[in-house]
């Protein structure tokens, strides 16, 4: 009887450890792919050079083309506005009123985005 209980306990411990290891691997890989962001109203004092994800809606009439591939625009969460500078190709869904996540850092009082992600609703249809 004692041996049977011991074997069952060992089996349960091995299954538990395997499940914990599997969950840890899944969460570690998800961490790299899930994009969390802060809305403009939650951004207070940002450290210079610290990587940050800022998200909100592109404010109407705030898109300014500075050069061929450089733009500035303002995102808002209807509480606070936040100016963003971006250089590169814009996402296909980028337009006024569209949800955007900007990944970048603060430099000399301006947020310099190195990547823009356009958010869409559940009825996404790629541009034709």
UniProtKB/Swiss-Prot annotation:
Segments on the Cytoplasmic side according to the record's topology features: 1-8
N-terminal signal peptide: none
Keyword Transmembrane: yes
Location in or out of the cell: Cell inner membrane
Topology of this chain in the membrane: Single-pass type II membrane protein
Coiled coil: none
UniProt-annotated binding residues for heme: 120, 124
Annotated transmembrane regions: 9-29
GO molecular function terms noted in the UniProt entry: heme binding; metal ion binding
Role: Heme chaperone required for the biogenesis of c-type cytochromes. Transiently binds heme delivered by CcmC and transfers the heme to apo-cytochromes in a process facilitated by CcmF and CcmH.
PANTHER family the UniProt entry points to: CYTOCHROME C-TYPE BIOGENESIS PROTEIN CCME HOMOLOG, MITOCHONDRIAL
Family: Belongs to the CcmE/CycJ family.
UniProt-recorded name of the protein: Cytochrome c-type biogenesis protein CcmE
Source species: Rickettsia peacockii (strain Rustic)
């Amino acid at each position: 009887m004692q041996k049977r209980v011991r074997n069952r306990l060992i089996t349960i411990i091995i299954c538990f450890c395997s499940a914990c290891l599997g969950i840890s691997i899944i969460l570690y890989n998800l961490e790299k792919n899930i994009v969390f962001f802060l809305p403009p109203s939650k951004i207070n004092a940002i450290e210079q050079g610290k990587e940050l994800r800022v998200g909100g809606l592109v404010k109407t009439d705030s898109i300014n083309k500075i050069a061929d591939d450089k733009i500035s625009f303002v995102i808002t969460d209807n509480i606070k506005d936040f100016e963003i500078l971006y250089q590169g190709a814009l996402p296909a869904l980028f337009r006024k009123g569209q949800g955007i996540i900007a990944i970048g850092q603060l430099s000399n009082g301006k947020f310099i985005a190195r990547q823009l992600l356009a958010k869409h609703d559940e009825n996404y249809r790629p541009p034709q």
